[in-house]
């Protein structure tokens, strides 16, 4: 029955979304067409608003009778004929999806999100789906297809538009162009300009005007002041107009959309704040009638707020942590509107919905490309946080550089700026390539660089930037306290750090193409370096003895395998529990996951009180400095065996 219901909803959505935005393709995810573009460029380099070509008519969404009515007393009824003169628009906005396409033990995918959006839209008068940037880069399946699998999904869903974010540039402009060609919706960014022509770049539009049952909604898209966050070599041919220049562009575009018949103006901005108030990223003058509602992104904060002029601003957390939803009631007789609902819908809500088949269909379509995500690399015996992983990568940078160039150059260090993404740690258990690609999605190649001594000290050896990780070899350690400020030294870093102008690095040579931090880490895991378990059982009594002789809050480097009976589960989300050996010895377990990283609460067959389990984890001695509580525990364990 569930499958029949899902098919009926999909059919209804195919009909209904034609009223607002592009027609979703529910039959063949590979059958897509290019977005409509406008060639009539203005003198300032911008282009006129494009009009969505979708048929606004549909059997379930008849065109509204919007002409010839008045409602001077604003009672939502025509003063003459008495019919209702209000309709509602429901906006569903995604920002910073970061390619989280397939559900994992740590993040939601679009399987349940698809069903949630379809069911919600089927019940709405005028549903509109839009995206506010950073949609592609981050998840393994999206990264391996360079965003195409996400764009294909957005085609299927009938998105009205997608604003470009800074991470859309991580692979270079050519891949933005590839996605623009595939998309049935326009990529928006009113303020991205070509450095050589001083005109708006060809692969995105300023706005789109969509028709909804006789009414028209304009959507303006812009990227925020985040140019410096992009690797310099990826944006060397473009620049962003920000500040007062961006305000002027948006005002002019709003006026053009109003002149073209727009009843409402939506601003989709890849920039945002923390939610306390609207910050400097947004010019409040735009709330003086130029925009009616703002959907934001980039900062990965969840908020719904109203600015001083009463305009709503919404953002969801990012990494598929949720979506923004706003319902706006519009009176087409007098042009007045009000936001009747504005909310952040968490992924915990839509993850419970039935999986939509489109995800499996698209994975099948791209199977020759995305298969690498499931490549098994080996076993990680204990959870490793992002800092530990980045320390290891810095050492791997150094080792790779010394092996390649060490005979010719005295290499001081390896490392540089390293950003780790969600979930921010590597789970214990079996590791696949996709696990690494999710944490380290960036395609920055290794380079040998020269650097002046003073910059070596300030930018690397003694930097205060906590995102810089370095490893010095024996030579580097021998000279690090005696650096000549005017001397020339050599380091191994990656192209993100080498292209960052303030580092003042000179590239000498580049390592093999398409070898990135995650690839070095993958080979390291394949060599068995993360499998530190002996596989032998250690008694609970011995675990308690070993832990009692450890310093406060210390953790072993090795993982230990323990068997015992569960006598208590005191946290049903993470699986915190107490084990007994039947001889009076009790052991605390802080966290249990499956071998594939699935968290305790998401396991299909959870260990319960009375079960016998074999777990593997490092030993940790946890001492609370405030209370003096002293606990010996297995820290973030992996379930090896379960006996009911």
Q: Can you say where each PLM-predicted feature lies in the sequence?
A:
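Bacterial signal peptide processing site
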Residues: 21-23
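Acidic, metal/ion-coordinating pockets
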Residues: 85-351
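C-terminal motif of bacterial Sec signal peptides marking the signal peptidase cleavage site
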Residues: 16-19
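Intrinsically disordered, low-complexity serine/threonine-rich repeat tracts
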Residues: 27-64, 70
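Sec-dependent signal peptide recognition
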Residues: 2-10
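OB-fold single-stranded nucleic acid-binding module
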Residues: 535-644
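Catalytic centers of hydrolytic enzymes
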Residues: 88, 100, 122, 238, ...
């Amino acid at each position: 029955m569930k499958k029949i219901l899902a098919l009926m909803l999909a059919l209804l959505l195919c009909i209904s979304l034609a009223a607002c935005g592009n027609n979703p393709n529910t039959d063949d995810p590979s059958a897509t067409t290019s977005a409509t573009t406008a060639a009539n460029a203005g003198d300032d380099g911008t282009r006129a608003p494009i009009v969505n070509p979708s048929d606004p008519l549909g059997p379930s969404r008849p065109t509204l009778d919007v002409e010839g009515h008045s409602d001077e007393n604003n009672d939502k009824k025509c003063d003459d004929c008495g019919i209702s003169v209000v309709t509602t628009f429901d906006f569903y906005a995604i920002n910073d999806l970061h390619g989280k396409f397939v559900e994992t033990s740590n993040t939601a995918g679009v399987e349940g999100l698809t069903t949630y959006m379809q069911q919600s839209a089927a019940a709405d008068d005028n549903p509109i789906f839009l995206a506010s940037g950073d949609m592609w880069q981050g998840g393994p399946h999206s990264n391996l297809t360079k965003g195409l699998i996400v764009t294909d999904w957005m085609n299927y869903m009938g998105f009205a538009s997608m604003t470009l974010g800074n991470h859309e540039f991580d692979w270079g402009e050519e891949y933005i162009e590839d996605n623009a060609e595939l998309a049935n919706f326009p990529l928006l960014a009113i303020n991205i300009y070509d450095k050589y022509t001083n005109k708006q770049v060809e692969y995105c539009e300023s706005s789109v005007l969509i028709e909804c049952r006789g009414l028209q909604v304009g959507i303006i898209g812009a990227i925020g002041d985040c140019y410096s966050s992009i690797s310099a070599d990826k944006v060397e041919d473009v620049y962003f107009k920000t500040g007062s220049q961006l305000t002027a562009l948006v005002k002019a575009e709003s006026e053009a959309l109003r002149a073209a018949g727009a009843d409402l103006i939506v601003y989709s901005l890849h920039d945002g704040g923390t939610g306390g108030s609207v910050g400097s990223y947004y010019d409040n003058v735009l709330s003086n009638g130029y925009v009616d509602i703002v959907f934001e992104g980039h900062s990965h904060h969840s908020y719904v707020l109203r600015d001083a002029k009463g305009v709503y601003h919404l953002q969801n957390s990012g990494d598929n942590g949720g979506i923004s939803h706003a319902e706006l009631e519009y009176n087409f007789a007098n042009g007045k509107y009000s936001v009747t609902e504005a909310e952040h819908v968490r992924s915990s809500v839509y993850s419970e919905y039935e999986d939509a088949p489109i995800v499996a269909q698209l994975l099948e379509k791209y199977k020759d490309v995305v298969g690498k995500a499931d490549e098994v690399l080996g076993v990680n015996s204990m959870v490793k946080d992002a800092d530990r992983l980045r320390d290891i990568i810095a050492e791997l940078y150094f080792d790779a550089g010394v092996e390649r160039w060490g005979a010719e150059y005295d290499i001081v260090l390896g490392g540089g700026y390293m950003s780790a993404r969600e979930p921010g740690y590597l789970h214990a258990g079996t590791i696949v390539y996709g696990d690494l690609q999710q944490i380290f999605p960036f395609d920055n190649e290794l380079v040998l660089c020269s650097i002046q001594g003073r910059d070596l000290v300030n930018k690397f050896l003694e930097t205060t930037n906590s995102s810089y990780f370095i490893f010095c070899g024996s030579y580097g350690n021998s000279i690090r306290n005696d650096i000549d400020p005017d001397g020339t030294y050599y380091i191994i870093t990656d192209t993100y750090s080498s292209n960052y102008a303030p580092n003042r690095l000179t590239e000498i040579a580049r390592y093999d193409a398409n070898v990135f931090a995650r690839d070095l880490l993958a080979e390291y895991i394949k060599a068995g370096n993360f499998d530190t378990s002996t596989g032998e059982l250690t008694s609970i009594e011995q675990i308690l003895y070993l832990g009692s002789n450890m310093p406060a809050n210390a953790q072993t480097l090795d993982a230990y395998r323990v068997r015992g009976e569960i006598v208590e589960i005191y946290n049903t989300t993470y699986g915190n529990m107490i084990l007994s050996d039947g001889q009076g010895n009790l052991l605390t377990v802080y966290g249990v996951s499956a071998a594939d990283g699935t968290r305790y609460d998401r396991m299909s067959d959870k260990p319960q009180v009375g079960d016998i389990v074999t777990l593997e984890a490092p030993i940790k001695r946890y001492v609370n400095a405030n209370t003096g509580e002293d606990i010996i525990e297995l820290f973030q364990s992996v379930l090896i065996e379960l006996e009911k």
